Each structure stands twice: as structure tokens, then as C-alpha cells.
């Protein structure tokens, strides 16, 4: 597994926070990207943002509900870190709503959320949400009620998803271990059991720095990828999915059949959650527009948007520390004029594309329930395909 150090191994379950980066990322393999990345090329390049993970991996063989195999986890994104009590302006959008992101009704109505933003598997949304409510009540705000933002993608191809292995303490640990700096990628956090374009999926991140009128603004993206059909996949414009259409396909190893594992999931069905952060001063309606650009980044990867895919996006701004002002009838906030947003939109598109590509590069082959195995995207063949289509850049 790339980009991850495990600080603890408990009863076969791997628990980790946001760890230092190790191993290659997409740029290291010569994948070309437009735009200037931040220092870590991660969502944490937006000052104050912290990311934490808990990755749960245990058991092997036949699926036994409640026992495993377990291939799942939790991801936490804290817009202003663990210590801040200040909400962030935010907006959300979807390009295909076959999924869930809690808290969006209230987010849409008031234009901000309290944080943290959590991502897990489809059937663990409730327990993670409840854990966050408890954390907010105990640690952050003495408020009357909370509506946390918790999103999901489906990991039932590899994970005992109906065994409910994600517990409140896992969500809390993801929050408590969240950190700034380099961010782990691949088979980590909520992304442990995911697939993407028929290869191993998971978690990825990227960022862009935009210069405007003598000022620098950063846009960071974190994705949990579980979407796309193999023939669609394009990397830097090269038809990687077509070139590898019959190779490295998911398979069942052992006595079980694929039918015993896929639970009727149609090809292309899956999901992607995209979290965007920026320090550019933007209001909720502008952040909703920013969130929409995730679909453009997905399109650069060749995605067409399948019927059963839950493609849900949220964007927030760390500017304007007086979002929730107490006292007074008027507050003053800063915002960028709409005619200055195009470069921010472009940065979000670029960072989304690179974050997804980083997932495919970082994620390792993983075997889960009933011996079902999802192969990693082979690095050498990716480079060969990029070279064939004259898209290979010098490795970073």
C-alpha cells in the first residue's frame, strides 16, 4: 500500500491517521498535468485543513456477515482543524445522485457547515454521523443540535458491508488523528474497499495554486473514488481503458463465484465523493458553482456518468472567519467577484483530475470477500501507453 505508515495494528485491524507520503504519485510516473500544484499537492495545502484516516483490514476467504472479511474505513476532513469553532461557507452539488451525503439540506439553506466532513462506506453513514454529533457536542460547540456532513461510496465488492464493522470509535479516531501536511493515498480510510474504472480505487488528493492580481489562492481536492467503466478510462487524454480493456480485470480467487460477490451491482455503478477546499473568499452560491467543476475533472478521465453512480461534491472556503457572527445585525464578508472565478474553476477541474489519477497510481491490488480481487493499475504499462500516445512527460 502506498503513502501509508501504520502506527498501530490492533486485532488485525489497521488504524492510521494522515501519514507522510511514500512511493510514487502520478507525476512521478510521468503523467502530465496542467497547472501549478501546492507544496504537498494535497487538499492540506489550503491552510488549516486537516485529514485523518482509520483503515480497517482483517480476515480473508468466504463472506460471513458480521465476521468479514473487512475492507473498509473512515476519512475525516476538518476545514479549519480540530481546534477551531468557526464554520465555513460551503456549497454542494451532484452530477448523479445515486448516493448519500447527510447534512446537505441544512448546508444548502444556511450556506455553511460546522465540520468535520466525513466519508465512509454506504452502510456506515449512520454510525459515523452519530459519532460526529457526539464529538461536536463534547468537544467543539455547546450547541443544541448538529447536522454533520457524511458521505459514502459502496465497498461491498470487497468488504462485509452488512457486518457494520465501522464503529463510533473509528470515526472519532479519524478526527483525532487528522493532520496537515502530506496526505496518504490509495487503500486508506473510507477508500480501502473501492474500485475505479475496473482497477483498484480509493482515496486521492491534489491541489492548485492560482495567481490573481498579485495574490495567491489555493484550491485543494480530496476524492474517494469508486466509479467508472474500464473502457472509459483516459489518463492525460490517452485511452488507457481501451488499451487495457481485457487485462487486469477484477476476478474471484478460490471456490466462490463472482455472482456470489457482486450483489447485482451493474458495470459502471459505484460513486465518487469530491471534497474541495479553497482559501479564496467565496460565498455559498459561488462555492456551489465551484463544486460543479468536479464533474469536469471526472470527464477528463473519460467518465460518462452511469445511472447507478453517486457522484456528490462539496466545496468550502476557509476565508471569512466571521461566518457565524454572534451579536450585531450586520456582518462584513469578503468575496471574489464572479468574473474573477474562472481561474478558480479551472484549478478545481485540474486538481480533481489529478486526484483521481493519484488514486489509480497509489492503490494496490486487494483481495476481499469470497476471494474477489481488484487489480492495481500497472505502472509500467501506464507509462508505455502514455508514451505510445505521446503523452509521457519526464518523471518528477
UniProtKB/Swiss-Prot annotation:
One Pfam entry name: Peptidase_S58
Stated pH dependence: Optimum pH is 10.
Summarize subunit and interaction data from the UniProt record for this chain.
Answer: Heterooctamer of 4 heterodimers ((alpha:beta)4); each heterodimer is composed of an alpha subunit and a beta subunit processed from the same precursor.
MF terms in GO: aminopeptidase activity
Q: Which family does it belong to?
A: Belongs to the peptidase S58 family.
Where does the protein end up? Answer: Periplasm
Catalysed reaction(s) here are: Cleaves N-terminal beta-homoamino acids from peptides composed of 2 to 6 amino acids
Record's protein name: Beta-peptidyl aminopeptidase BapA
Q: Where is the signal peptide?
A: 1-21
Give the regulation of activity: Inhibited by AEBSF (4-(2-aminoethyl)benzenesulfonyl fluoride, Pefabloc SC).
Extra remark beyond the main annotation: S.microcystinivorans can degrade microcystin, a cyclic, toxic heptapeptide that contains beta-peptidic substructures.
Organism domain of life: Bacteria
Q: What Gene Ontology cellular-component terms does the record carry?
A: periplasmic space
Keyword set for this entry?
Aminopeptidase, Hydrolase, Periplasm, Protease, Signal
Asked if the keyword Hydrolase belongs to this entry, the reply reads yes
Summary of the function given for this chain in its UniProt record: Beta-aminopeptidase that can cleave synthetic beta-peptides which consist of backbone-elongated beta-amino acid residues that are not processed by common proteolytic enzymes. Can cleave the beta-peptides beta-homoVal-beta-homoAla-beta-homoLeu and beta-homoAla-beta-homoLeu.
| Record EC number | 3.4.11.25
Residues the record marks as active site: 271 (nucleophile), 309 (proton donor/acceptor), 311 (proton donor/acceptor)
One GO biological process from the UniProt record?
proteolysis
| PTM entry text | Autoproteolytic processing to generate the alpha and beta subunit is required for self-activation and is proposed to use a similar mechanism as substrate cleavage.
Amino acid at each position: 500500500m502506498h503513502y501509508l505508515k501504520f502506527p498501530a495494528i490492533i486485532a488485525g485491524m489497521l488504524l492510521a491517521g494522515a501519514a507522510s507520503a511514500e512511493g510514487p504519485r502520478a507525476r512521478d510516473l510521468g503523467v502530465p498535468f496542467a497547472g501549478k500544484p501546492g507544496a504537498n499537492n494535497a487538499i492540506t495545502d489550503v491552510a488549516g485543513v486537516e485529514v485523518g484516516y482509520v483503515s480497517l483490514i482483517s480476515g480473508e476467504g468466504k463472506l460471513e456477515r458480521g465476521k468479514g472479511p473487512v475492507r473498509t474505513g473512515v476519512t475525516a476532513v476538518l476545514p479549519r482543524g480540530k481546534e477551531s469553532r468557526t464554520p465555513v461557507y460551503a456549497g454542494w452539488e451532484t452530477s448523479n445522485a445515486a448516493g448519500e451525503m447527510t447534512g446537505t439540506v441544512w448546508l444548502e439553506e444556511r450556506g455553511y457547515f460546522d465540520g468535520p466532513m466525513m466519508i465512509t462506506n454506504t452502510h456506515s453513514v449512520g454510525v459515523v454521523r452519530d459519532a460526529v454529533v457526539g464529538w461536536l457536542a463534547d468537544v467543539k460547540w455547546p450547541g443544541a443540535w448538529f447536522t454533520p456532513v457524511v458521505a459514502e461510496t459502496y465497498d461491498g465488492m470487497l468488504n462485509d458491508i452488512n457486518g457494520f464493522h465501522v464503529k463510533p470509535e473509528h470515526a472519532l479516531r479519524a478526527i483525532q488523528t487528522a493532520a496537515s501536511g502530506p496526505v496518504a493515498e490509495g487503500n486508506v480510510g473510507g477508500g480501502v474497499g473501492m474500485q475505479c474504472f475496473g482497477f483498484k480505487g480509493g482515496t486521492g488528493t491534489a491541489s492548485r495554486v492560482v495567481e490573481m492580481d498579485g495574490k495567491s489562492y489555493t484550491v485543494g481536492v480530496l476524492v474517494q473514488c469508486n466509479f467508472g467503466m474500464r473502457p472509459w478510462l483516459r489518463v492525460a487524454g490517452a485511452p488507457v481503458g481501451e488499451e487495457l480493456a481485457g487485462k487486469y480485470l477484477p476476478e474471484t480467487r478460490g471456490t466462490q463465484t463472482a455472482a456470489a460477490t457482486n450483489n447485482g451491482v451493474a458495470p459502471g455503478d459505484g460513486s465518487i465523493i469530491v471534497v474541495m477546499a479553497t482559501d479564496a473568499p467565496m460565498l455559498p452560491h459561488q462555492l456551489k458553482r465551484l463544486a460543479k467543476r468536479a464533474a469536469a475533472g471526472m470527464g477528463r478521465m473519460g467518465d460518462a456518468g452511469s445511472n447507478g453512480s453517486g457522484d456528490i461534491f462539496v466545496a468550502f472556503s476557509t476565508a471569512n472567519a466571521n461566518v457565524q457572527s454572534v451579536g450585531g445585525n450586520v456582518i462584513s464578508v469578503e468575496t471574489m467577484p464572479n468574473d474573477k472565478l474562472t481561474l478558480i474553476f479551472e484549478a478545481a477541474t485540474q486538481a480533481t483530475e489529478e486526484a483521481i489519477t493519484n488514486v489509480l497510481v497509489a492503490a494496490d491490488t486487494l483481495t476481499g470477500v469470497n476471494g474477489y480481487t481488484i487489480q492495481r493499475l500497472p505502472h509500467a504499462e501506464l507509462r508505455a501507453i502514455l508514451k505510445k500516445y505521446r503523452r509521457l512527460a519526464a518523471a518528477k
